[in-house]
Amino acid sequence: MRYTNSHLEDWIENLYKKIDITEPEQINFERIAEALDIRLSFKPVTSFALKHSGIYNICLDSRKSRTEQWYDFAHEFCHIYRHEGDKKTMPATWTDYLDWQSNYFTYHFCIPTCMLRNINLPYIQSHAIENVAWLFKVSPSFAKKRLSIYYRKLTQHLFSQTVTGNLCPPFL
């Protein structure tokens, strides 16, 4: 079955290639931060990101587990790399949207489609979830949600082909 990347998936794939991360076991927020010159710190406060004097900083909540810090890193990374501006001056609905977008980004950043596509996933859903959770060092509930996003897109593409009768989409 063919899969067409979204712009977000292409952006993440290109970023990982740029910093020479091609396998799930290479994904590590310290490595990503170092490769992209992001200052990383850990403090017992809610995670946040900021840009000061042209330098990106991500502060992760030291009270959280490493897995939770990984989610926070991805979320904050999205804010500094894909969102600009001072959230304090933006309407609440816009900042809510940016947070939703960062949460969605987190699923794709922690489990990149370009790597997920190369895995032979077990047919039994619970086994696929366990496999992805272990491989990408995320929780089973996180892996389940990401697989749901992935399978929904595959199904949507298959449905679209069936409805249009177009078995070879023009974009491939």
Swiss-Prot record:
Q: Which domain of life is it from?
A: Bacteria
Q: What is this protein called?
A: Uncharacterized protein YqaB
Lineage here is:
Bacteria, Bacillati, Bacillota, Bacilli, Bacillales
